[in-house]
Structure formats: structure tokens, C-alpha cells
From Swiss-Prot:
It is an enzyme of class 3 (hydrolase). Residues 404-605 form the 3'-5' exonuclease domain. Represses the transposition of Tc1, Tc3, Tc4, and Tc5, perhaps by degrading transposon-specific messages. Also affects sperm development, sensitivity to RNAi of mainly germline expressed genes, silencing of some germline transgenes, X chromosome loss, and is required for cosuppression (functional silencing of chromosomal loci induced by transgenes) and for silencing induced by antisense RNA oligomers. The gene is mut-7. It comes from the Eukaryota. This is Exonuclease mut-7. Its EC number is 3.1.-.-. PANTHER family: 3'-5' EXONUCLEASE DOMAIN-CONTAINING PROTEIN (PTHR47765), EXONUCLEASE MUT-7 HOMOLOG (PTHR47765:SF2).
Amino acid sequence: MEEEPYKRKLTKAEKKAKYRTDYAEPLKSRREVLKAIMNGPESERERKVRAKNREFFNEDYRSGVNIYGMAVDMMKAMPDRGKTSGQSLAVWYLEDFGVWLKESGQETELRQKYLTGTIQINALDVCTIGQKQLLSEIFDITKEKFTEDITQLLDAAIKKQDFSVAADMAIQYNLLRDHHFEHLVLPLMLSGKDQTAYKLISNNERMQQQLVEFFDRMVGISVVAVEEMLKPYKETKIMTIPMEKLTGKTLDKLISTIINKNTHEYNFSRELSKFAKNHSQNGNLKALKFNISERYEKGKSDDNYFQHMVETFTKAEDVREPILFYLWSSNDTEKQIDAICFAIYLGIASSSSYQLPNVMRDFFRQPDSKLREAKELLVRRKTLQVPLNGEQLFVFENERRTQIHMVKTESEMNYLCSEIKSLSDEPAPVYVGFDSEWKPSNLTAVHDSKIAIIQLFFKNCVWLVDCVELEKANMADDWWQKFASRLFGDSPVKVVGFDMRNDLDAMATIPALKSSMKIEDTKNAFDLKRLAENVCDIDMEILELPKKTFKLADLTHYLLGLELDKTEQCSNWQCRPLRKKQIVYAALDAVVVVETFKKILSIVEEKNKDADIEKIVRESNVMAPKKDKGHKSYRKLKTIPWLELYDILRSHRNPTRSPQRPHDIKVIVDTMLIGFGKNLRRVGIDVILPKDVSDFRKYLKEIERVGGEHLRHIITVPSKSYEALKMDYDNYTIAIPELNNMSPVDQLIEFFDLFNVDIRPEDVYPRCTECNSRLQIKFPGPVLHFLHQYCVIHVQNVYRADMSEFPLEEWWNRMLHINPDDYDGVKVEMSRPSPTSKWIVATVPTGCLHITRQTALHTNLPDGIEVRIHKVPDDEFKRRNLSFYVCGECGTVACDGRGNQASESTSQEC
């Protein structure tokens, strides 16, 4: 059989020779001169290049050539002609040419003599987009011609679907036109270039509105309908993002970003939310359904529930009918009475009201006893437990009786500011408790003030600053600024909160404080959470807490013996009037942060006499840099020899339980456990590694749909997502606590204990960690070394550009002397069609390797795969008796030093 001619890859030098463009003189000589300068010291380049440019201009002028034509030819010949940033020969040349023309005093005459329309057109063609403005000035190109040229380039870029380039031109030259929404803005969004699209329409309210309306049309419709809507963009390959990004929560998040977040980052209009009616309705519906669930399934207080519902019903009439239907269609009598109660409260309890679902209209035509019960319920609800005028509330009703004062007017704010100022006269530093309650996120635009109440505790009194009432009263900005200054200025008081940075950020959203309150300048804010963490870092035994992570309720329970009632935590703090329970709940948090802070300090003083209390307090300052806790020095799995790893894991097989072989165990890991998943593959477990959350969900749906032998265990860690997974996949979901805090070996031990894995010595590299394939080809190290030397060192000139001739015969002879005993008994058969042929193939029991073609073929596969040998460091081949594994499906190379434990043995994914 006649040998097929061998096609060798070209070296870099050969490619240069083949594709090099030859330039005529003097362009060729000048080009080489400039290249030589650019290869010299960086600090000298610009000065020398600009001096040389002036020599060229003077030389061309004296010789009488067309200086404009020569300038265009030089621009074409520049080695870095397409460069758009950093030091650029083309830019320097163009700038110097413009300066030289002006200094010559003959610019007008030279233009009349040499500058033609053809040269102007050629000039526009040779320069980059960023150079066109300067070039137009030098080559006397009119604004109309310049705009026409840029517009043509922009349209051409759109036609080629090079949307980023088109957007850059439109932004730079202000060329955004009405038709660009359909042909440029949407394609940018649908190809994952959101930030570019936002920048492009940052000053175009009409297109911002169009963008919101486009995505809002997808809210609430089926996936099939969304696919049909986007079909034209899919067919033309404009849309490259996965469909999952435009459905469900990801679509909601995208619209929220456009109408809220972008008002700050890209100066978008603040009125965009009114064009997202479906999104707004959907958000309110979800919030109300969650509120109903909290009330009927988790025992949320009725007054809290009712307050939240009527506030949303009042602000968003479009949710009345669907929510009332949601309550009524439950066929739960209590919920139906609830629906009737809301209808009466809203004044729509009529058989003709269009805001009622049909079933409720029918009810009001012939009402039964539920109507009477609903009216009685409404009477109870309307007599909310709100403070009477002048009624004094207390945090504690016992002998302490800590008073609560409301601040709703300018005069009350003035009095509070004077009280805060008086704290400076105290002989010892005063601790001020600080907390805040926020408005519901679904009823608050991102650019509005987030904060509803600020709570302060000092001198055995709690002050509740009612931000909502003060906003309604249009309190002057000066009072807000005075309040913030007295509290966080140069005051000697210590303001204490829990996880306080979030409260400070919320306070800074008050319009009057947005520009004046600099959180980074705050020096007297201290965080109870950081204080407790710092003490636990010293010694967990000091506070005797069961864990290092905690909420405020945990600390008050363990340290004060006080149980915090959190039923009001998710109240609608924007709704007025505030109920007694809300007021007392809010006030209590401000009290306990100070008392817990002081309690911790007293415990530290008592149990650790050597502790530096001042330092501990100083390090709990909100603005203090967080401690660098460092990273635990875990031993990476790839540095552990296989037999050592095997010895560790085999001891975790329980003989009283049925064992499982690694390849029989099928799992999919959560997106936060990708590294753990690769380690499981390392020991042979069949693992799916999702690329992202949408990919994870896609796999879960597919696994559930197919079922049977395709079912897999879902491995995650305790979290909110785990709770959600258990609801849908309870029988398959496993959460392993603290998994991310374990070393790789401990992670495997935890898994082996859980599944009772039967691992064996021969299981070395049973599965590719990249693609999960079990089709591995094992080669002695010298064979892969030969491949690396030929394909990487020689052909690609990676390490030795001077290697023009490869010592092929020397390597061939070396292959013939490989001793199988040095490489786990792997026998290699070397073959080539003729003694001088460059076709060299190494064959082992599980496959073969075509060395000079960089291709491996597994015995059980029909096609070969390119070996990813360039990923292997050259140093790997210096260790003796090393065996390598090539994946027959993806070409990944891995190695292990198991063959000779006496040598510098290691297990390494290369």
C-alpha cells in the first residue's frame, strides 16, 4: 500500500516567509528602521520614531513625491497598522504628519498640489476607526464625507454581525439611529453583550423604553411562546445566549437591572418601570403569594399579613383580580373569607366589579354566611393595635420599662439631635445602639431611599426615626445632614449595630445624605458581629458559642438568655401607621445590640485577663480592615501518589454494608462543587459537572424525564438551594455539611463513608477529570516525551526557536529500548511504514498514538483525537518511570508516578 505523503505543520519562520508582504522602496527600508527602533528600549521609542518621521517627511518633500500619497502608503506599511491601544507607530506617524504640514507653512499649497479625492478615499480605508477623526482633519475630509464613511463601516459591521465593533463606532461618533434598535441594540443583548448595549443607549430614553417593552412582553408567557418570539434571531444566528436566560427568574433579574440598577451605572431614565407592567405585576404577584403562604402555612401574624396585602393592593390595582382568584380557587373557606374581606376593604364587593374574578361576582349575587364572617374579620383587622395619641410604649414592661420615642417631625428631630450632642459631655464614652428596618424591595425602586426606620438606643431610651413620615413631611435636608453629622461625625460616642455596614449603606440612600454621608469616613461605628467573630478567633471557649457563624438572635439567646421574637422581621415597614408589635420589635433590636456588645467585653475581661480589650474593640470597627485569615494549606489531590491515596481511602470501606464500585455510582454536583466533582472523577465516580445554574437545571430536568438507569444522586451543601432541590428531588438530593471547608482528601473520605465505595489498586486514573470518559490509553512516559518534543518544542517552536532539524532517528531508537517493567508492564510496539518514514506510531494494549500527527486512537473508538500535549509542562518528563494517560475522547493528558514509588513520585493532572 502506497504511503500517503506526510503533511508537516509549518514553523513560525516558515509561515512568515510564506505569507510575508514585500514592500517597494523606500517603504521597505523605512519599515525596517521603525521596527528596529520599536525593538529597542521602551523609554526611547517614541522620541526616536518621531524624529525619524520628520526625516521621512523632509526627504519626501525634497524629492518631490506626492507627500499625501506617500503618507497613505506609509500608513499601509506600518507593522502595527491595526493596533488600537498602547504605543502605535501609525498614530505617531499621523500626528507627526499633521504637525509637519502646519509647521511647513505651505499646507494649503501642498493640499492643492497633491491631495486628490482618490487619496482621501484610500486614506479613510487604511486607518483604524480611532484614527479617522485625526486623519479627516489632516486630509481635509468633510464632516459629511467622514460621517458617510463611518456610517458605511457601521452598516457593514452590522451586516457581518460584528455588533461590538458597530456599537463602538456608534458610541464614538454619536451615530445611533432609530433603526439601530432592531438591528444593533437587540442583537447586542441577544448575543450576551449587555454592557455594550447599555452604554450605547445610555442617553436615548426612547430605546431604553423599547428595550424594557421588548423583554417585558416575555414575562408570564410560555417558553414555547418565547421561543417563537425569538425564532428569527435564532435562525439568523444573532441570538447566541441560551433560552433559559430569557425565562423565569433570570428574565426578571434582567428587567430589574435595566429599570433599576442602570439608572446609576448608565444614567437610564428613572421612569422605565412604568413600561414594565408585566414585570411589575409578576413581582407583586409573587410577593403576595409568598405573603399568603407565610400566613397560612407558617403562622405569620394576621395583622402583619393584612397590612402587607392592603398596601400592595392599594399601590398595584392590577394584582387584585388574580390574587383574589388565587385565594378563592383554593376552596379553603378561611381563604375565601379572606378574599371577601379584601374586596369589602377595597370597595369592590359588587357583582358588577371588573376587579373581581367571575366566581366572586357570582358569590356577591347570592352571598352566604361567609359575607358576615368577612365583615367581622375586617372590623377586627381595622382596629389594628396601633398606639393611641400620647400613649407611651416601652421595650420591656417589667421594672426596666425602657421608653420608646417616635421622631416624625422636624421639631422631634431637633430634640433628638440635641440629645445626641449631649452625649459628648458624658465622662465615659457612651454606647449607642443602632439598627434599621427597610422598605419592601418589591415596592421600592432602586434609586429611592431603602430605609423605613432608624432605631437608636441610649440613656435607657429608644428613639425611632420614622423616615417614611419625615419624607411625607418634606423635612429639610439640613436636618438629615445634622442628624448624620451628630451621630457619625467627630462624636466620642460608639455607635453599635449588627452587620452594620448594610444599615449604613441603606441610610446613605436617603436623598439628603447621598452626597454628604461618606461611609468610608465613619470612625465611630462598631459591629457586634465582627466583635463576636474576633473573640472566637482568639478562643472559641471564651464565649462558649456552639458555632462561629451566628445571627443576632443566636447571640442574645446564648449570651443574654433572651429570645428575640422575629415574627415582625418581614413586616411591611413602609406601611403606616406602625403597629405596637412592630414598634416594640424594632426598638428591642437597638437595645440588645448594645447589651450584647457590653456582655461580650465583660466576658473577655473575666476569662482572658491578658486580652487587649481596646484592640479587640478597635478591630470590630465597621471600617477596620478585615483580618486576613489566610487559606488553609490543604494538600492538593494531584500531588498525592495513587497508592498513597488508595491506602487512605480503602480504610473507609465498611465490611458490614454492601460495597459499590466507583463506576457504578452516578452523581451530579451543584455548581459550587465543581472542584469536588473533578476529584470524584479522579477516583472513578461517574460525575456530571454543570457549566452554570441553567445547565444544572437542564440536567436535572433531563435526568428526571428519562429516569431509570439515568437517575443520579444530586450532591450539594446545606443552603436555600438545597431546600428547593429537596422539594423537587427529595429521594436523590444529598447535602454534605461543611464540604467546601474540607481538604480534597477529607472530601473524598466523606463521600466514601457515605457511599461505601469499593476502591482497588488498579483503579488509577479510571476516568478523565475533564470529560468523564473511562476510555483512557496508558503510555510509558518516554512516548509522550517524544510527542512533546516533536509537536511542541520543534513544530510550534515554543521553547527552542533554533531547532530547525528534529533528531527523529535518535528518538526512534530510544523508543525501541523502552523496558515495560519500568512502566507497570505496559508494552509498546513501535511502527513506521519505511525506515525513513516520518509516520511513527506507538501501539499499546488500549490504543495507539501517531506521534508526528499528535493523534491518539482508543481501541474502542472509531476516530482519533488530537492529544492536548501542549498542556503538559516540560518539567514533567524529567521524572523517571512516569506513566501517562491520554483520554480517548477529549485528548486530555494525565500522569501518575505509581510505577516507581522510590522515585520522586507524584500524581499529577497535566
